[in-house]
């Protein structure tokens, strides 16, 4: 071949590599130096099949993807980051991520996913961050999370989660941040957070929580932040928070439906006296009931909540004492009356003999 032709071919290959056009999917941009394929905002309905095999990062956000088939990432074993946020994904097929053994970050936020397949986590043993926020999930099953053993951050916020299977997060030994705010949970059960000894932040804000079981947080040995604001709590059990055995845990409890009475004052008094528990928003906690205290800050009335109860107890105690004393006096009078009567009756025969 003529030297000039060879030279031109060499230049062409060099240009193709430099501009990242070699084996690049149509309507996407490829950057060989960073192994990055950018398909963001291209109105694509399917994940391209010709994504280069050496790709580390795929940005497929802001497209029209409606489902993720099992073959979507076939052969892309070197992938580290997959961004699929803000699409229209309604269904994730079984085995969809099974060919991504080195994946570290998966973003599925802002889609329409209503259910995770049972094998969702198969092949995701090295995943560090999973974002599923702003979807339509209603129930979490344990099988979907089984293999996320390296996960450090899980974002499930802004879904429709009403229930979770007991032990759903049990295999997530390295989890540090769990975001469950803005869902529809009503009861925090004791089995939800088993084995999460490394969890540092648990966000449960803006749910419909009315009750928390006593041992719900007992296994969280590293918890530094517990967010419970914006729920429907009226009362809480001191044992629920006393079971949190950490170096220091900050609590967020404002914007609930607190019934401000002596019981609540005593519980918060105990919590505030525990050295490792810190209610960061205590000054913003307000009363919802009783009606005469609605809207008042708890800190403004907490010292008075037990006064009325104490006064009532004193009145009851005084009434009981008066009743008891009156009964004793009456009994004593009756005793003396009966004694005098018996004495008079016993003198009758002697008087008649003397006469």
Locations of the language-model features?
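Leucine-rich repeat
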Residues: 31, 45, 50-55, 66, 74-79, 89-90, 98-103, 113-114, ...
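Consensus "Asn ladder" position of solenoid repeat domains
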Residues: 42, 63, 87, 108-111, ...
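Classical eukaryotic N-terminal signal peptides for Sec-dependent ER targeting/secretion
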Residues: 1-10
């Amino acid at each position: 071949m003529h030297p000039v032709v060879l030279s031109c071919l060499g230049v062409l290959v060099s240009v193709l590599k430099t501009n990242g056009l070699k084996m690049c999917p149509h309507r996407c941009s490829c950057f060989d130096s960073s192994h990055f394929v950018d398909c963001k905002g291209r109105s694509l309905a399917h994940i391209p099949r010709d994504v280069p095999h050496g790709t580390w990062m795929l940005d497929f956000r802001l497209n029209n993807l409606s489902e993720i088939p099992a073959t979507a990432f076939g052969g892309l074993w070197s992938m580290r980051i997959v961004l699929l946020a803000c699409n229209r994904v309604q269904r994730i097929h079984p085995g969809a991520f099974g060919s991504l053994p080195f994946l570290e970050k998966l973003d599925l936020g802002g889609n329409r996913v209503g259910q995770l397949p049972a094998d969702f986590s198969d092949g995701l043993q090295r995943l560090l961050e999973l974002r599923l926020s702003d979807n339509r999930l209603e129930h979490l099953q344990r099988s979907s999370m089984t293999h996320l053993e390296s996960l450090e951050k899980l974002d499930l916020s802004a879904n429709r989660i009403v229930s979770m299977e007991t032990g759903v997060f049990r295999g997530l030994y390295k989890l540090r941040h769990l975001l469950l705010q803005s869902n529809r949970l009503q009861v925090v059960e004791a089995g939800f957070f088993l084995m999460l000894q490394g969890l540092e932040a648990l966000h449960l804000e803006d749910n419909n929580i009315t009750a928390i079981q006593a041992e719900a947080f007992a296994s969280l040995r590293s918890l530094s932040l517990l967010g419970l604001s914006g729920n429907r709590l009226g009362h809480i059990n001191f044992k629920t928070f006393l079971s949190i055995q950490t170096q220091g845990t900050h609590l967020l409890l404002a914007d609930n439906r607190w019934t401000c009475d002596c019981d609540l004052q005593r519980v918060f008094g105990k919590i505030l006296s525990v050295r490792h528990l810190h209610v960061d928003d205590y000054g913003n906690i307000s009363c919802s009931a009783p009606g005469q205290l609605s809207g008042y800050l708890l800190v403004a009335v907490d010292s008075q909540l037990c006064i009325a109860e104490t006064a009532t107890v004193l009145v009851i105690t005084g009434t009981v004492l008066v009743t008891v004393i009156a009964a004793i006096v009456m009994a004593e009078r009756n005793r003396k009356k009966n004694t005098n009567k018996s004495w008079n009756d016993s003198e009758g025969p002697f008087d008649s003999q003397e006469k």
